[in-house]
Amino acid sequence: MVCPDVAGRGKSDWLSNPALYAVPQYVSDMATLIARVWPATLAWVGTSMGGLIGLGLAGAATMMRLARAMRPRPDGLPAQADDLRLHRLVLNDVGPRLNVEVLQRIAGNVAAQDSYSTFEAAVAAMRQISTTFGPHTDAQWDELARHIYVRQGGGWVRHFDPALAVPLGAQVAQAFEAGERILWQAYDSLDCPVLIVRGQDSDLLSAATAGEM
């Protein structure tokens, strides 16, 4: 199992150009990672943004196969080793239809550069903005917070680049519509088993979108 820190988060580097904090860049990064690991079977489990990356990988894989099919090559050569293929896909709390209001709310949360004097205060703040995550035990909230906050300068700050919010805040309605069309095309191109997971109170993946999927 490989669980990477996407660019700008955790132990991964921050990008000098915040405009690159977007799904196309993440898909490119993950395709490179997959090429390095090259698993015999690729099962992608994606929550929220991770699911969008999975859909992006699926779309990229389809384009690669189409391009290869149209490109003649000499007989007898082995299949190319860069044949990216998803064997299974889990989409948790995400789908091809984007909720602009929710994404703007997420951008606002990401942009807030809050610092807390104690870890307990950081956990309390995280619980307040994460109520739609559902019920968790105190121990589970603490464990989640340890992946989100890091001790820095005598306080606790979130372990990611605040500039992650820049591309989200700059999006316009037309861009969202174009993005949705691409995501639906990627979803329709899937030729592997797909598991869709939706929480009862999710506002990122609506019941209507889940039903359409």
PLM region spans:
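Conserved serine/cysteine hydrolase catalytic core
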Residues: Y149-M213
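Helix-loop "lid/cap" segments that line or gate small-molecule binding pockets
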Residues: A107-A112, A121-P135, R146-Y149, V172-A175
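Active-site loop/oxyanion-hole signature of alpha/beta-hydrolase fold enzymes
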Residues: V2-V45, G59-A60, M64-D82
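Active-site loop/turn elements of alpha/beta-hydrolase fold enzymes
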Residues: V6, L91-V94, D201
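Conserved catalytic-core motifs of eukaryotic protein kinase domains, centered on the activation segment
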Residues: S12-P18, E101-V102, A207-A208
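Flexible "cap/lid" loop of the alpha/beta hydrolase fold
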Residues: P78-A121
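Gly/Ala-rich beta-loop-alpha elbow adjacent to hydrolase catalytic centers
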Residues: G46, G50, G54
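Active-site loop signature of alpha/beta-hydrolase-fold enzymes
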Residues: R9-S12, R97, L204
